[in-house]
C-alpha cells in the first residue's frame, strides 16, 4: 500500500519538522517572512514531546517561540471551523495571563503574539489579518496582545497560478502544503532544500506513519459519531424535551471523547454547560 505523504498543513508534521532543535533556522526563516522582522535568536518551548514519542499528544498550543521581546504562539488550523477563533483566543489569553502573572510588574514591553496558519478561509479573502484589542474608535486597550491570521488558501492558489516571480517571493509559505512531487518541482534555496529533506525524513519514519494512521482512524470514527449525533438531535423532538435530549447527546459524545468544542457546535449548549455535565 502506498503510504500517505503528510504536509505541514498537518500540525503533527509541522511540529516534527519545525520544532526539531536542529531545524531552528527553518522556523526562523518562516517567522521572519510572516512577521517581517529580523530574528537574531529564538528559543523553542516544547509544548509536547516530539520525535522521541510521536504517540503522545495533549491539548496545548502547537508551538511556542521566544525571540527578543516577543512570545509567539503558532497554531496550525488545517480547516476553518467556528470553534477555532474562541479556542485559539483562549490559548493566547492563557499565554498572556501566564506572562503577566510571572512578571514583577504589569507592563507591555513584551509582545504576546499568536500566528494562525489557517486553511479554509477562501483564496479571495485577505492574505493576512492582524487583530488587536481596541475600542470601536481604534483606541488600543493594550498594545502587546496581537493575533495574525494567515490565509493559507492564498498561497495554495499562488502555487497553481504558475506565476514564477510570485512563487519565488513566497516559497516558505507555499512549501508547507506541497506533496512530495510538487516539492521536487518547486524553486529552491537552502531553506527549501532543508525543509524538503526533513519533511521527507519525518514521513519515512514508521512510527510517525503509524501514529498518523491511528489518528485518521480516530477522526473517521469521530465524524461518524458526530453525524449520528446530528441526526439524533434533528429527529428527536426539538420541542419540550429539547434540553434533556441535548444533555443526553452531550453525555454520549463526552463518553466517546469528542471535543467539547465540537459538542457545543452540534448541540448548541455552551462550553460551560457541557463542562458541568462532566
Label each region the model flagged.
Residues 1-208:
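Conserved single-residue anchors adjacent to enzymatic active/cofactor-binding motifs
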Residues 2-4, 68-77, 174-278:
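Short, charged alpha-helical interaction segments and adjacent helix-coil junctions
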Amino acid at each position: 500500500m502506498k503510504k500517505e505523504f503528510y504536509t505541514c498543513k498537518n500540525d503533527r508534521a509541522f511540529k516534527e519538522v519545525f520544532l526539531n532543535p536542529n531545524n531552528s533556522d527553518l522556523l526562523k526563516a518562516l517567522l521572519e517572512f510572516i512577521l517581517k522582522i529580523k530574528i537574531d535568536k529564538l528559543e523553542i518551548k516544547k509544548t509536547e514531546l516530539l520525535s522521541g514519542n510521536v504517540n503522545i499528544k495533549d491539548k496545548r498550543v502547537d508551538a511556542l517561540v521566544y525571540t527578543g521581546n516577543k512570545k509567539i504562539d503558532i497554531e496550525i488550523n488545517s480547516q476553518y471551523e467556528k470553534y477555532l477563533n474562541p479556542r485559539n483566543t483562549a490559548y493566547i489569553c492563557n499565554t498572556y495571563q501566564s506572562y503577566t502573572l510571572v512578571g514583577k510588574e504589569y507592563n507591555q514591553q513584551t509582545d504576546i503574539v499568536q500566528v494562525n496558519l489557517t486553511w479554509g478561509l477562501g483564496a479571495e479573502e485577505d492574505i493576512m489579518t492582524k487583530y488587536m484589542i481596541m475600542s470601536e474608535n481604534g483606541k488600543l486597550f493594550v498594545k502587546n496582545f496581537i493575533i495574525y491570521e494567515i490565509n493559507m488558501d492564498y498561497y495554495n492558489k499562488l502555487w497553481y497560478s504558475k506565476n514564477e516571480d510570485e512563487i519565488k517571493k513566497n516559497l516558505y509559505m507555499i512549501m508547507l502544503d506541497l506533496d512530495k512531487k510538487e516539492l521536487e518541482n518547486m524553486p529552491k534555496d537552502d531553506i527549501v532544500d532543508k525543509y524538503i529533506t526533513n519533511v521527507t525524513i519525518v514521513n519515512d519514519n514508521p512510527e510517525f506513519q503509524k501514529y498518523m494512521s491511528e489518528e485518521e482512524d480516530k477522526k473517521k470514527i469521530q465524524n461518524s459519531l458526530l453525524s449520528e449525533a446530528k441526526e439524533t438531535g434533528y429527529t428527536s423532538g426539538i420541542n419540550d424535551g429539547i434540553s434533556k435530549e441535548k444533555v443526553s447527546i452531550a453525555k454520549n459524545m463526552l463518553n466517546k471523547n469528542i471535543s467539547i468544542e465540537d459538542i457545543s457546535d452540534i448541540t448548541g449548549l455552551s462550553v460551560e454547560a457541557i463542562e458541568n455535565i462532566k
